[in-house]
Swiss-Prot record:
Function: Acts as a co-chaperone for HSP90AA1. Mediates the association of the molecular chaperones HSPA8/HSC70 and HSP90.
Full protein name: Stress-induced-phosphoprotein 1
UniProt source species: Homo sapiens (Human)
Region (Disordered): 192-233
GO cellular component terms, semicolon-separated: cytosol; dynein axonemal particle; Golgi apparatus; nucleus; protein folding chaperone complex; protein-containing complex
GO biological process, one term: cellular response to interleukin-7
Comment text on domains: The TPR 1 repeat interacts with the C-terminal of HSC70. The TPR 4, 5 and 6 repeats (also called TPR2A domain) and TPR 7, 8 and 9 repeats (also called TPR2B domain) interact with HSP90.
UniProt keywords, alphabetically: Acetylation, Cytoplasm, Isopeptide bond, Nucleus, Phosphoprotein, Repeat, TPR repeat, Ubl conjugation
Annotated crosslink Glycyl lysine isopeptide (Lys-Gly) (interchain with G-Cter in SUMO2) location: 123, 210
Record gene name: STIP1
Residue numbers bearing the Phosphothreonine modification: 198, 332
C-alpha cells in the first residue's frame, strides 16, 4: 500500500501543476495495485475532466460511487462529468442521490441548485419549442389571426430553431403578443406596472444575508483577517494598490489557511500589469486551497485569473489551458465565454500562420499529377492541403471541384465553384465547372443559366457554348416520371429546406384548395422566390 500512496501523491502533484497525462499514468498504475480504492478513481475522474475526456471522467465517477456509495465526493465527480456531457437531468439526479448520503455537503447542494437553474432556464429560454405550439396559438384569438400571415409563421419557426434570436425580435409587437399567449401572462400590462412598482418581497432577505453575523462563531484571528480584507478591498476599489497589498498581506498572516487573501493579492498584481507575480500568487493560492479543502469555486477563480493573465499577454494557448482547468473545477458562463474567445483567436492565428503560397503551389502540382493519373481521391487531398496553405487562390477551389465532380460529389463541387466565383468572378472555369456539376445532376435550367454567364464573360468559350446546347437538347428530350422529378428535386438541400418549412407546406396546401390564394402569396418576395424554386425543379406547376 505504500507504493499506492506514493503513486497517488505523485499523481496529485502532477495534477496540481497541470501535468495531466503524468497524473493519469500515476493514478492508473495505483489502481492496478489497489483496484478497490475509491479515492484513486475519484482523482483520476478529476484528471480526465481536466483533460476534457468527460466520458472517461464519468466512468471513473460511476466506479467511485459503486465502491463507496456513501461518499459525497464520488457523486460530485459523476455529476460534474454528466454536466460537461450536457446530460443535465442525470446530473441533477446524481446530486440528489449524493445528498441522500451527505445531506449537508455544500458541493452537492450547490451542484443541485446549478442544475435546477440550468434546467429551468433551458425550458424557459425556448417557449416556442413546446409540442402543441400551433394548437395553442390557434386557440387564442390574439394569435389566431396572425397565423394567416406566412411571415409570422416564418418568424415563429426561426425562434423555434434558434431561441437566441429572441432578444432581437422583442420590438415586434407580434412576438410580445405570442409570448403573452405561450407564457400565460399579460406582458403588456407588466411593462406598465414595472415603472411604478416597488421591488418584490423576496430580494430584501437576500440583502440581509451577509457574512458578518457569522463572525460571532469565528476565532479572533479570522475576524481580524476579514476586517483587514475589507480594508484591502476598499483600497483596491480606490486603486490604492500598495495599501491594498499591505492589508491583504496582514489578513494572510492572521489566517494563512484562507486562499482568498492570496488571490486578492494576485488581483492587485493583475491590475498593476505584473502578470508573472499574479500567476505565482494564484498557484500559491491553489496550493493552500488544496491543502485546506477549499471550495472548488475558489480554486476555479484562481485558475481563471491565471488564464486571464495569459490572455492579456496574448498567450492564448496557455490561457485556454488554464481556463479549461478552471472549468473542470467549477463551470461558469464568463470563463466559458472567455475560453471560447481565446480558442477562436488561436484558431485564426494558427490558420494564418499555416498559409504558405509556395507550399500551396507544391500541393497543387501534386494534385494535378494525381488528377492526370485518375487518382481523384488523392488529388482531392492535395488540393485540400493547397487550399489550407493559400485559401485565397480561386483556381484551387476550381481544381478540387473537378475532383468532386469525378467522384460524383456534386453538392461539394457546387460549393467549391461558388467559392471560386466569389474569389475571382471573371474566372471562366469556375462557371463551366459549376454548370457541369448542375448538368450531371440533370438540373438543366440552372446549368444553362451558368453556362450563359460564362458566355457573357467570353462569348468564344467553346466549353460553355457546347454545354448550353447539350442542356437545351436534354431539357427538350427529357420525359421524367413524377417519381424521378421528385427524387431529383428532393436531393437539392434548398428544396429540402423549403419543403420542411411548416409555413411553406401550409401555403402549398392553400394553393391546392384555393388557386386564387397564390396571387396573395406571390406579393411576398420571399415566398415568391421559394415557389419559383419549386417550379424550376418541377415539383409544382402553375396553370
Amino acid at each position: 500500500m505504500e507504493q499506492v500512496n506514493e503513486l497517488k501523491e505523485k499523481g496529485n502533484k502532477a495534477l496540481s501543476v497541470g501535468n495531466i497525462d503524468d497524473a493519469l499514468q500515476c493514478y492508473s498504475e495505483a489502481i492496478k495495485l489497489d483496484p478497490h480504492n475509491h479515492v484513486l478513481y475519484s482523482n483520476r475522474s478529476a484528471a480526465y475532466a481536466k483533460k476534457g475526456d468527460y466520458q472517461k471522467a464519468y466512468e471513473d465517477g460511476c466506479k467511485t460511487v459503486d465502491l463507496k456509495p456513501d461518499w459525497g465526493k464520488g457523486y460530485s465527480r459523476k455529476a460534474a462529468a454528466l454536466e460537461f456531457l450536457n446530460r443535465f437531468e442525470e446530473a441533477k439526479r446524481t446530486y440528489e442521490e449524493g445528498l441522500k448520503h451527505e445531506a449537508n455537503n455544500p458541493q452537492l447542494k450547490e451542484g443541485l441548485q446549478n442544475m435546477e437553474a440550468r434546467l429551468a432556464e433551458r425550458k424557459f429560454m425556448n417557449p416556442f419549442n413546446m409540442p402543441n405550439l400551433y394548437q395553442k396559438l390557434e386557440s387564442d384569438p390574439r394569435t389566431r389571426t396572425l397565423l394567416s400571415d406566412p411571415t409570422y409563421r416564418e418568424l415563429i419557426e426561426q425562434l423555434r430553431n434558434k431561441p437566441s434570436d429572441l432578444g432581437t425580435k422583442l420590438q415586434d409587437p407580434r412576438i410580445m403578443t405570442t409570448l403573452s399567449v405561450l407564457l400565460g401572462v399579460d406582458l403588456g400590462s407588466m411593462d406598465e406596472e414595472e415603472e411604478i412598482a416597488t421591488p418584490p418581497p423576496p430580494p430584501p432577505p437576500k440583502k440581509e444575508t451577509k457574512p458578518e453575523p457569522m463572525e460571532e462563531d469565528l476565532p479572533e484571528n479570522k475576524k481580524q483577517a476579514l476586517k483587514e480584507k475589507e480594508l484591502g478591498n476598499d483600497a483596491y476599489k480606490k486603486k490604492d494598490f500598495d495599501t491594498a497589498l499591505k492589508h491583504y498581506d496582514k489578513a494572510k498572516e492572521l489566517d494563512p489557511t484562507n486562499m482568498t487573501y492570496i488571490t486578492n493579492q494576485a488581483a492587485v498584481y493583475f491590475e498593476k500589469g505584473d502578470y508573472n507575480k499574479c500567476r505565482e500568487l494564484c498557484e500559491k493560492a491553489i496550493e493552500v486551497g488544496r491543502e485546506n479543502r477549499e471550495d472548488y469555486r475558489q480554486i476555479a477563480k484562481a485558475y481563471a485569473r491565471i488564464g486571464n493573465s495569459y490572455f492579456k499577454e496574448e498567450k492564448y494557448k496557455d490561457a485556454i489551458h488554464f481556463y479549461n482547468k478552471s472549468l473542470a473545477e467549477h463551470r461558469t458562463p464568463d470563463v466559458l465565454k472567455k475560453c471560447q474567445q481565446a480558442e477562436k483567436i488561436l484558431k485564426e492565428q494558427e490558420r494564418l500562420a499555416y498559409i504558405n503560397p509556395d507550399l500551396a503551389l507544391e500541393e497543387k502540382n501534386k494534385g494535378n499529377e494525381c488528377f492526370q493519373k485518375g487518382d481523384y481521391p488523392q488529388a482531392m487531398k492535395h488540393y485540400t492541403e493547397a487550399i489550407k496553405r493559400n485559401p485565397k487562390d480561386a483556381k484551387l477551389y476550381s481544381n478540387r471541384a473537378a475532383c468532386y465532380t469525378k467522384l460524383l460529389e456534386f453538392q461539394l463541387a457546387l460549393k467549391d465553384c461558388e467559392e471560386c466565383i466569389q474569389l475571382e468572378p471573371t474566372f471562366i472555369k469556375g462557371y463551366t465547372r459549376k454548370a457541369a456539376a448542375l448538368e450531371a445532376m440533370k438540373d438543366y435550367t440552372k446549368a444553362m443559366d451558368v453556362y450563359q454567364k460564362a458566355l457573357d464573360l467570353d462569348s468564344s468559350c467553346k466549353e460553355a457554348a457546347d454545354g448550353y446546347q447539350r442542356c437545351m437538347m436534354a431539357q427538350y428530350n427529357r420525359h421524367d416520371s413524377p417519381e424521378d422529378v421528385k427524387r431529383r428535386a428532393m436531393a437539392d438541400p434548398e428544396v429540402q429546406q423549403i419543403m420542411s418549412d411548416p409555413a411553406m407546406r401550409l401555403i402549398l396546401e392553400q394553393m391546392q384548395k384555393d388557386p386564387q390564394a397564390l396571387s396573395e402569396h406571390l406579393k411576398n418576395p420571399v415566398i415568391a422566390q421559394k415557389i419559383q424554386k419549386l417550379m424550376d425543379v418541377g415539383l409544382i406547376a402553375i396553370r
